[in-house]
């Protein structure tokens, strides 16, 4: 994949609201123009027209198309053919063949069904798959449930399992991973906790549903000054040692050095 991710704060924008496009692009690192769940069935034709007539920077835009096997996907692709957009998000992805059928596009697979959770490893191996995201709400609905989270806001075990499986599959095959949305717009503390966890385990970005969430996500991906200073100090020590060494009371080996390198890279992208 040659695409360099523009940043960690991504934002969904309904494709039938072209009045919001520029504002979304000004606020987010990447805008996901949504032709699927964010648009009512009666408004999808208008959404495709708006998408074609109101262009954004293709390097900072992804289009969420409709699911494989739907008439809406065919109409989406017809509309996209006349645009500069060549990166799409495929919702409810359940098979590698659904990804390779979109060979003209770079595809982010969205894992949000029981079958998708079981086939994510094969889907991300598709040559045109560049990343993976997971979604909790459709997943739980597909299981016959009605809540992805406990009362305290934490994910139930099945959602955590799919989150981890999606992350592992993406990273095992050299693709990026996006953490799912946080639906409680007012709960910025909960979002912060979840975004910090996404950083800690290796998600490259977290997707927002409201512009007010973007600053929280960016802050989570920006290393604290003390952490960044430590990372730089420990990396400066490497030429002075052979193999494992002790630094500031901590054993430093190859994994610790990789952690330090990740911190410095995140700071450079912030």
Protein language model features and the residues they cover:
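Expand to "…catalyze enediolate/carbanion chemistry for C-C bond making/breaking, isomerization
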Residues: 1-270
């Amino acid at each position: 994949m040659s695409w360099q991710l523009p940043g960690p704060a991504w934002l969904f924008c309904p494709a039938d609201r072209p009045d919001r496009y520029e504002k979304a692009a000004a606020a987010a690192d990447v805008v996901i123009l949504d032709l699927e769940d964010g648009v009512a069935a009666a408004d999808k034709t208008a959404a495709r027209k708006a998408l074609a007539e109101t262009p954004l920077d293709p390097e900072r835009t992804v289009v969420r198309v409709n699911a494989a096997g739907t008439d809406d996907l065919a109409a989406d692709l017809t509309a996209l053919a006349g645009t500069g957009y060549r990166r799409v998000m495929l919702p409810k992805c359940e098979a590698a063949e659904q990804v390779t059928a979109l060979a003209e596009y770079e595809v982010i697979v969205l894992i949000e069904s029981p079958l998708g959770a079981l086939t994510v490893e094969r889907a991300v191996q598709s040559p045109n798959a560049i990343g993976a995201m997971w979604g909790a709400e459709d997943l739980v609905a597909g299981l016959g449930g009605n809540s992805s989270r406990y009362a305290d806001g934490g994910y139930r075990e099945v959602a955590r399992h799919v989150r981890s499986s999606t992350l592992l599959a993406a990273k095992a095959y050299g693709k990026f991973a996006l953490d799912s949305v946080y639906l409680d717009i007012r709960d910025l503390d909960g979002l912060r906790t979840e975004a910090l966890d996404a950083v800690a385990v290796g998600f490259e970005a977290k997707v927002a549903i409201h512009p007010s969430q973007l600053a929280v996500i960016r802050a989570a991906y920006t290393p604290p000054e003390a952490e960044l200073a430590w990372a730089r100090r420990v990396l400066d020590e490497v030429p002075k040692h052979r193999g494992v060494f002790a630094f500031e009371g901590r054993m430093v080996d190859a994994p610790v050095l990789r952690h330090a390198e990740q911190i410095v890279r995140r700071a450079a992208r912030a």
